[in-house]
């Protein structure tokens, strides 16, 4: 058994050196000397510490930390030898996470890790444990991301709206982060589940988001990825606290510092991020986008392609005329407009947002229902349209034997009664047999997404589509095959009749309302038919952004920014 380490972080001093953004605009600083460290403490009004004893390691200047240069192998001894938490948290030798916590059912999966229910063996307190296998940390960037996330979570204050990191462990195989359990569901899901949704409810949620930004900025942390999915309720009670849970893209910053790396989620990304010259004001913009969606149910900047979304963000012309904006108070609209100002210098600070009359008196915000249209929009916001589901099934049915060999074997294993279809229970039992630990809510979500005909079970095509749903649709041959399935006459377009034929139910009927919705959503040039380019844009929009890995997003957004520079949409800061 390799060495292990553990920490129960409480203050910044216990954490050690918080890592800097490894793609930061500034050059890396050399390792701090005793002189520079003392000078830094004096700038912050602290008394200089005495010179450390010989052979003792001096505490680094947090702003001069550079990410590790190690490039771990994909597995084996090289990956195990990487000390991810070295210099970030103090060591506690030979204590394993399972010594203190009993790990239970899976709660969810992320890019690097898996989160399980963790029960304190002594107190029986229920927490969440995110385990990050070292074999998944393939590059120095991956290692630096985890180090920075741990340092940031440990340095943030004990605030009711911030999930608390309770302990961090490291052994030869993985890093384990034990934190507060938030099992009350996502922000939007709770809104949809409520029978009545009002401006006052939106104000309450928006105030929590603003409090998170204020707490982060006060401690020198820029979040950089504020979005509804990163806010969970602590419990299922109606008055449960809403908490920010993900700091994977957050960075430490100093006043006046500028950043260049393009990160975040497209709908919530500030224009200056696309220009690669930004500071903490980006969090105010993202919070403003969340508030806009809370009030009307759709994002303020929308298009069917990534470049279209980016151009809409750069223009910054949000729509305040459509339903339900006419019935929303002037105070609410005033705050949203201020937060979505394209000039970051004119945006309010987090404290100014909280002091705005609409949020300062959030409990007295109008209690008039915003209408079912908002709840319906919020529900549809993250769902694929029916055409996209059908297209994924077509792709699945035309994959080569080599591409689906493993999936075919799994299908045969799960189809225990050999009737050519898999029920949800068979899916659960089969995944258990093959050692999968996919969380039950995720199984149900995939089942619902892939069950195109809604009959409660998956045939082979739908089953393979589950896998396609989780992959980036980058193979043009696959997309062309799916397009030709709909384009029966080979005209190069999918017309309304072909769309109706492809989406007809067993009786041969196609819902006109569904067809109208798909055409409105996909037919961007409004010529009454869907071109191949429009089809590809539909298939590559939305889902990719939520499922893409962090590294993939970095490269994708860099490419997007370069294309916007080339076509003159943005001008780089000098």
UniProtKB/Swiss-Prot annotation:
Listed EC numbers: 2.7.11.1
Autoinhibitory domain, as annotated region: 365-395
EC class: transferase
UniProt induction comment: By infection with the rice blast fungus (M.oryzae). Induced by abscisic acid (ABA), salt stress and osmotic shock.
Comment field (misc): Plants over-expressing CPK9 show increased tolerance to drought, osmotic, and dehydration stresses, and improved pollen maturation and spikelet fertility under normal growth conditions. Plants silencing CPK9 show decreased tolerance to drought, osmotic, and dehydration stresses, and diminished pollen maturation and spikelet fertility under normal growth conditions.
Main location, first listed in the record: membrane
Residue ranges of domain Protein kinase in the record: 101-359
Residues at which Ca(2+) 3 binds: 487, 489, 491, 493, 498
Region (Disordered): 1-64
UniProt KW S-adenosyl-L-methionine keyword: no
Protein name, per record: Calcium-dependent protein kinase 9
All copies of domain EF-hand, residue ranges: 402-437, 438-473, 474-509, 510-545
Lineage of the species this protein comes from: Eukaryota, Viridiplantae, Streptophyta, Embryophyta, Tracheophyta
Reactions catalysed, as given in the entry: L-seryl-[protein] + ATP = O-phospho-L-seryl-[protein] + ADP + H(+); L-threonyl-[protein] + ATP = O-phospho-L-threonyl-[protein] + ADP + H(+)
Claim: Secreted is one of the keywords in the record: no
Subcellular location: Membrane
Source organism (scientific name): Oryza sativa subsp. japonica (Rice)
GO molecular function, one term: calcium-dependent protein serine/threonine kinase activity
Residues the entry annotates as binding Ca(2+) 1: 415, 417, 419, 421, 426
Role this protein plays: May play a role in signal transduction pathways that involve calcium as a second messenger. Functions in signal transduction pathways that positively regulate responses to drought, osmotic, and dehydration stress. Regulates expression of stress-associated genes in response to drought. Involved in tolerance to drought stress by increasing proline and soluble sugars, and improving stomatal closure. Required for pollen maturation and spikelet fertility.
Transmembrane segments: none
